[in-house]
Structure formats: structure tokens, C-alpha cells
Amino acid sequence: YLKAVCFDGEVAEMEEGMDTIVGNGGIRLSGGQAQRLALARTLCHKRPVLILDDPFSALDRKTEEEVFANLRKLTADGIVILLSHRLYLFPQMNQVLWMEDGKVTAGTHEQILEKCPEYARLYEAQAGSDGSREHAPQTPGDHKAADKEEKPEERRD
């Protein structure tokens, strides 16, 4: 699982390798290292539903994309609910939930772009901020995405 979260190389370089103590009495991990270690630990315990709250927030984009691709492979037979403020991965999701003020709009990334002007605005702003406007292809799996800044329509709870 360390390889899946792109942490195996760094662990191999640690003086004690896999036996390295981290935290109290051990070495201090960076935010990205700690986040990847936590995700690896989570992946060790296979569950049919996995809920991840911004699991890539401390990762650089290249590492995030690699970890996300590996995560999709490892969880292809399950459901992943990914909460994130970074929308560029959402075109790869089978289902996107956009929430705001107690209202939920569900659909594919393209459907949410059409239904929710605020989602479209935020997505375009983020896509433009890194110079990339590429949309990733839709791929199979029951992965779902829910954005923290979220937007309206359809259901009210």
C-alpha cells in the first residue's frame, strides 16, 4: 500500500526503513508524508465503502494524480466517496454530488457543469489556474465525489 500512495521510495530511504518510528519518539513526517501514510493504513483494511475527506490536500499535483489512479485500481470493486475542494479530478468520477444550503444536485461532472453555474465557475477557475483545461476521461467504478464548497438543486433534506 505504500507503493500505491507513492511513499515506498521515501520509506526505503529512511534509516530504519519499514521499522522507522514516526511521531512521538520517532521522526517527524511532512504533511504530505503523513497524509499518504494515513491513506496507506486505510487501504490496508478493505471495506466496501471508503469515505475520504480531502485525502490529497497536502500533496503536489503529480503525486495526487498518481495516488488517485492507484486508488481507483485498488477500490474498483467498492464505493469511494471523495470530498474535495480540488475539482480537476471530478471528470473521472462516475457521480458528482454538489451541495449548498441543504440542496443536492447529483449527476456526472458534465451534467453538474450544465446544471450548476457556480460549480462550472469554480471548475473553470481551477482549470485555468494551473494552465490545464483538459478533461480526464470517464472511467468505470462506483466512485463518487462531493465537493465541500458545494452547490444546489434537486433534493432538500
What are these regions (language model features)?
Residues 1-21, 46, 63, 118-121:
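Conserved "ABC signature" C-loop
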